[in-house]
Amino acid sequence: LDGRGGDRIVRPLLAALDRDGGRALPMTESLLSRISGKDNPQMVLGAFEQRWQDPGRITPDAGRCWIALDRVRDPGNLGTIMRTADATGARGIILIGDCTDPYSVEAVRASMGAVFNVELAQMPEDDFLDLAAGWPGQIVGTALPASRDYRKVDYAGPLILLMGNEQAGLTPALMKACTQLVRMPMMGRSDSLNLAVATGVTLYEALRQRHPPEDG
């Protein structure tokens, strides 16, 4: 922090940090700027240990879904998906194969803090296929060749929502592991949506089905 430890907003943060055994280090604004990579940094920066879920502890949840991402490469997409996962109450995110780092600066910024609220796990494709083989509920994947409209699928849990790589989509093995393959209608000249947008649209359809809007 930049020396404003007496600030009314900062004081409770410092008290909580002290209770949990953390350390507070005062530093100059110029050093904060160098660490954050921003010309006008916030007056407080935090450093936290990365949290990863043990893949062996990924369990079905009837009321919430897991999001599985196949080789997602764009940190902005991943950060936005983490934010949407948190907003829709998803259980967590499974990163399959060679994915971008969810703890990179770009991903953390795009998540707007949601990186600390969702469970994250990573595994190779073969391990995910083993998980999928024993999954007791639906695995819904999005794919351009699919013929079923995403709005006509029952997203009852336990659910895995499987999303493909930004350029290549899902691998053939992952598509085969899905219980349903869905598409989104494209009414204009574009043939697909951005990965983060497509994930958000599908998550909110699943949320709408689980929690339909009240009358009035």
Where are these regions (language model features)?
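Active-site/ligand-binding-proximal alpha/beta "capping" segment
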Residues: 140-188
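Internal active-site segments that recognize and position negatively charged phosphoryl groups
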Residues: 63-102
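Structured adenosyl-cofactor binding patch, chiefly the S-adenosyl-L-methionine
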Residues: 46, 84-88, 102-115, 172-216
